Amino acid sequence: MKNSEDMVKRSVNRRSFLRNGVLAGGAAVAGAGLLSSGKTMLAQENDDARGSLDRGDVAILRFVAAAEIIESDLWQQYAELGGITSDSSTNPYQAAFQVLDSDGLQYITSNTNDEISHATFLNAYLESKGEEPVNLDEFRTLQGSQATGAQNIGRLTNLMHLTVDTSWYIRYRSTTNPDFGATYPQALTITNRTSIPITDADFDNQMHIQAIANTAAFHFGTVEQAGSSLYASLGQKVTHAEVLEITLGIGADEVAHFLEWWILPATPSPDRRSRITD
């Protein structure tokens, strides 16, 4: 995680709750019932915030720490090539993001730093409770981009052969609700596409590099909506008040990230902004 640290320096099922609770007599009544069963969501009143953690809470923290490390890995790849750089020059990939949003480069860098801080904090918290931190370094074996700006290091994630779930784009613009059985098609099909330039040759064609950035724009939303759902789900299963605070806090940050990205692929624009193939 050294490279990541350097960048910093720079169950209550929601669907069953809605179906059963709301239909049984309204959200207020169902909410009261939910709170009365408090142990799955809140710690006991006499729970010592400094005490040891329940095994289930440790498992949840280790799971989300692993997820944040993986998320940090993919965002770091985006930041190296498409985020804020130390010099004033802009490569064609960065320029393609600026076509979508003039602040796109800052968003990418900020999102990256946030994800790295999440992973760092979760591991530090685990250690403070006498638990083993999560380390995935042995799995950093994938080849990343060889374009100028990318670090020559092993990766956990491969952004050069992506299949992206784009159904969220329809879901979050729909008047229907998945909690009541609604399903959503793909907004468009993204299969085996790269979302980062693979070599400097990808910089040479404007339409081509714009298609790569457009693919990334959909991937950003896919990643962050998943993170938002993850913390909302797992937060309902913890028993320690302090762990609940952590899941709520980081989960809220994931929601904020999604709010940055959900609109990006919808930018009203010429055709070159909406293409994912060139």
Regions found by a protein language model. Give the residues of each.
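All-alpha RGS (Regulator of G-protein Signaling) helical domain and cognate RGS-like helical scaffolds
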Residues: 2-8, 19-26, 40-278
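Cell-wall glycan-active module
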Residues: 35
